[in-house]
């Protein structure tokens, strides 16, 4: 019984030595579905907005290059990425605040997917599949 208490207390002490980091990884996979199956969208675009949730941008209009507009108020993405022929889009985010991610399909023009992640969500993994 004493050994169990000792192991538990040592574990807690070790945990306190790990520095907190504002970095977290994000990995996004974008696909599209057609009559022939599901395929990787190799030219998809991903836009990341720090400090907002998707509910914060209800009513905004989506413009080219990930710009969001509401009555002349514009929000531009903090990060712009393209799949560039890769199956997934992976990056290291330099902070741990809430984020919203908008993914734009290159296969289905004008189609976007949107999701948000809370500060504690780590690592971030998102799979977006656009259909007909």
Question: What is each of the regions a protein language model found here?
Answer:
Residues 29-31, 47, 102-104:
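Residue-level recognition of well-ordered beta-strand positions that form the cores
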Residues 35-72, 93-95:
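Short, ordered, surface-exposed loop/turn motifs in non-cytosolic proteins
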Residues 59-83, 114-119:
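Solvent-exposed serine/threonine-rich low-complexity stretches and specific carbohydrate-binding patches
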Residues 72, 79-100:
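Short Pro-Gly-centered beta-turn/loop motif in secreted/extracellular proteins
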Residues 1-12:
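Sec-dependent bacterial lipoprotein signal peptides
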Residues 18-20, 34-38, 79, 91, ...:
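Generic marker of residues within folded, mature protein domains
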